[in-house]
Structure formats: structure tokens, C-alpha cells
Amino acid sequence: MKQLKIGNVTLPNRYILGPMAGVTDLPFRVLCKEQGAGLLCMEMVSAKAILYNNKNTESLLEIHPDEQPVSLQFFGSDPKIMSEMAKRVEERPFDIMDINMGCPVPKVVRNGEGSALMKNPKLVYEIVSAMVKAIDKPVTVKIRKGFDDSCINAGEIAKIIEEAGAAAVAVHGRTREQYYSGQADWDIIRQVKEAVSIPVIGNGDVTSPQKAEELVKQTGCDGIMIARGAQGNPWIFSEMITYEETGTLPERPGKEEVRDMMLRHARLQLKYKGEFIGIREMRKHVAWYTKGLKGSAKLREEINRVESYQELEELLFQRL
């Protein structure tokens, strides 16, 4: 099993759960860890929200003792605030600090944050170097192919990130303009790999063990980041590990296994978020878990009326 070293942190394997707002919360990360994910990326956290002691941010910062190694992702555009807030949270039990330079969401981009930073190489350097100087933990950065077709500069930005002292860079093979549409351009990941000597983590359209193998062959990347490919599919990590070790694909989980995983996920949601929020958040997860299963469209419709764990359990046992 190939390991991956990021700064002074050694990951047990190269398969990384990518950060997804509203998805990679503590309950989901625990499930992915149990399936063997080598690194778990938390939901992005606003550096300004930490500065202003936003109460909702505290729950985003919660880490389970069993989930290391884990990466905490900041977003922002002010080097001073970002570095000072990184220092403020450094004592928490995360292993790696990541900087979000890939988020395509309009309200983030309008503030000059997320993927908007791809248009400002000078500020990229200032943010990364300030963060690296502020904390002892490794700093990584997640970027995109570029902002749009007129600004494809992942290679240039990756070099700046390396010069500023980052320990690794993750590259999503789409521009901000593309969001998640079309196909990810893996060739840009190869170009970044050739441009820098720090580890490069490839991201985009990795939905199976074969795709992960293909990504490594095409790009030479050091790590593989799985984001949407893990939605409703925490098994993807154990499947990738088995495939790397044996060259064979394990059987996909059957209906009963999917149902058991959903109920375990729901119990974790309730434990950390209470029934009201936990059950509502499970609705989207159930839609992902059951995608492609017979009768899943009807189930998704019914799930939106479920208000309690008991109702969820009864419905899943009826339908699956």
C-alpha cells in the first residue's frame, strides 16, 4: 500500500476524502475513516467566522478522536486574519491546515475568496506564506484548473504555492466557470505535477478504483482526492485499497448493507446534531445512498416527509 507524506504527516494511503460543504461533517467522516480513507478533509470554515466567534462554526470544528489524520480547510482572502485564526485553532486535534482556493460558489467568489484567488497570484503568495509562518502544522492548498478559459493558470499558481512554503497542492481539473459540469481535465493535473516538487493531489471525476488508477497513470499524481464520488458511497475507499492491493474489485454492497450504513449514518447524525437537524440532513444522504436502486425515486420522495429516526428506520426496512 503506497503511503503519502505531507510535511511531517504520513498518510496510511493515498486516498483522500475531499472537503464538501454540508457533506463532510463529522458523522460522514467517521464512516469514510472506517472504510479506510487515508485523510479526511473537513467542511470549509471561514477564517472571519472564527475571528467573530460565530457559534455555528464551533460545530464545524469538532473532530472525533478516531478520525486522524484530518485536514481543516480555511477560506478567506485576508492574509493577516487567516494566519492569526490558523494560530488560534492550531491546538485543536487536526493534522493539516488546508486553504480553499477552489470554491466556485458566487457569494464566496464575490468576496474575492475561494476560486477568485486564482486571479490574484500576489495575494495567493501572501496568504500561503503568512499561514506557513504562523503555524507548525503542514499547510496545503486546494486549487482549480483556473478561473475560466481565459485564465488557466494552475501550474503558475502551484509554483507560487510551493515557493510560499506549502507542503502539498490539490488540483481540481475544472475551472471555476465550469463548476462541476463537463469532464475534469486531468492533463492540467499532469502539468502541475511536472511544475512542482511538492506532492500533487489529483481531484475530479474519481468515481471508482479503476478511475483512481487511471488518474495516477495519466498524471503521475501522488494522492487521489475523492469528493462527489464518495457521496452515498463511503465504501469507495475500501474498494480502492482492495483494488490497489489485489488488483480485483470487491463486490458492491447489497441493499441490506446500504440500508445498515444509512441507519448507522443517521444514528451518528442524531448523536452529534440532534433528531430535528440530523434527520433533515440525512434526506440528501439517503438520496445519494439509494441512487440507482429499484424504487429509489419514490423513496426519495417519501424520505422528505420523515421526521424521526423511527420513521426513517421503518421506511428503509419497508423499501429495501
Predicted regions and their residues:
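Aromatic- and acidic-residue-enriched carbohydrate-binding clefts of CAZyme catalytic domains
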Residues: 118
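Active-site beta-loop-alpha junctions enriched in small/polar residues
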Residues: 20, 45-47, 75-77, 102-104, ...
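Short secondary-structure transition/capping segments
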Residues: 51-56, 109-112, 152-153, 181-184, ...
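Alpha/beta enzyme core
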Residues: 83-113, 122-198
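N-terminal small/glycine-rich loop or linker at the start of catalytic domains
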Residues: 2-16, 50-70, 103, 107-111, ...
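Alpha/beta catalytic cores of nucleotide-metabolism and tRNA/nucleoside-modifying enzymes
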Residues: 1-3, 11, 15, 21, ...
